[in-house]
């Protein structure tokens, strides 16, 4: 099981979107247990400056950006809409 690490930016993003917590539970459970996410989350690697990150869609226009660090850490980097995150 991976340990969850939240960046300061993720913490700020989450404060703005605290109502999304329930939708995150299934995603986080699967990620910390290294289980594949269902297709509905559209999990995929990012490119460019985000090339070592992945994103998944919590809702149609609501994205979680994260990194799997080694075998032990799930780093939550950003959360928000595509426009908020510049994607």
Language-model-detected regions and their locations in the chain:
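Short hydrophobic/aromatic-rich motifs at helix boundaries and adjacent loops
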Residues: 1, 14-15, 34-37
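Compact soluble domain cores
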Residues: 22-36
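Enriched for short, Lys/Arg-rich terminal
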Residues: 1-4, 12, 19-22, 56, ...
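A short, surface-exposed loop/turn module that caps and links secondary-structure elements
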Residues: 32-57
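Generic secondary-structure microfeatures
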Residues: 28, 32, 50, 78-80
């Amino acid at each position: 099981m991976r340990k969850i690490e939240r960046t300061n930016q993720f913490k700020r993003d989450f404060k703005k979107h605290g109502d999304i917590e329930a939708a995150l539970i299934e995603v986080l459970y699967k990620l910390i247990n290294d289980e594949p996410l269902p297709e509905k989350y559209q999990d995929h690697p990012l490119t460019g400056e985000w090339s070592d990150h992945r994103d998944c869609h919590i809702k149609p226009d609501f994205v979680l950006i994260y990194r799997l660090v080694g075998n032990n850490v799930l780093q939550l980097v950003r959360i928000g809409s595509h426009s908020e995150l510049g994607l």
